Structures are given as C-alpha cells and as structure tokens.
Amino acid sequence: MASNAPATKSGLYADPREDWLALRKEEILDPARPIVDPHHHLWDRGGQRYLIEELAADIGSGHNVIATVYVEARSMYRATGPEALRPLGEVEFANGAAAMSASGGYGPAAICAGIVGHANLLLGDAARPVLEAEIVAGNGRFRGIRHSSAWDADAEVAGMYASRPKGLLPIRSFAKALPASRRWD
C-alpha cells in the first residue's frame, strides 16, 4: 500500500521517506555484472546528511557496484580563503571519503574513485589555478569539473541556481576557461 504521508523538507531537498523506500525491494538482475555508479553526491548540511555510511548502505544492496564517481554538489566548500578556491574544499572532502573507502571499512566498492569538482569558469584564465589545485587535491581521482548553467526567471523554479546568469554558455570568460579545463583529456 502506498504511503500518503506528506513530504517534509528540513533542508534544500525533501527529506528521505523511509516508509516509501521500503515499499519495494529492487530485484538484483545480474549480481555478477560490475557497475560503476557514475554520479553521486555526499553532504551534511541543513539538517540533511548523506555521507559515506549512507552511500555504502545504498550501493551494498546486492548489485555489484565496484566504484563510484563523486559529482560536485556545493558541499563542504571551504569557509574561508579566496572565493575562487573555496570549491577546493569539496574535492578535498571527496578525496577524504575515497581514502576512507580504501580502508575497506565501507565495503568492497571504491567510493569516490573519480571526482568531478567545480571551478567558476566565469573567471576565465583565473580559473586555471583552481583547476590545478583541484587536480592536486584529487590525488589522482580528479576527472573534471561541472559548472551548472541551469537558469530560470522564476527563482522558485531555479532554486539554488537562481544566481546563475541567463545565457551563461556563450559568455566570453566562461568559454575562455574551457581550454584549461581540458588539460587532462
């Protein structure tokens, strides 16, 4: 029977509904097939927590998840220092989760085996030191950046992306930083 309990929101997103999640057990179709989860986040903010313990429980459900790729979520940015370098904290955080995973204490999967961070490409050439610092902080795991270009005139729809400029992709400084971001191709 479906749950009719209303969703609650204690942070940026709706809170997990354990009653709803428990309604269906997913069948493991091919438990021997190796899987890399290509996109996940970790955070502890606004009363909501999803860290390595929660991820390990989710990927340890019977599927053969052998590795994961962490994708930036504006999580664990540095609280101080130059604004441009604050996203470096998220790469350091994801690399720390990868080190925890390497201990074997969270299951066999290589959690955060790949890391996708963020650099403000509107900085143009000034984004280069950020990218270089993220490559170092990723300890061989850094794979690229994500600079969201989502935009909507309605702040209610745009949510946390409401501050993004309209028409971001053709902005000259944004495009100028792209060659620096391709260094590791």
Task: Explain the meaning of each model-derived region.
Residues 2-185:
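Helix-coil boundary/capping segments in enzymes
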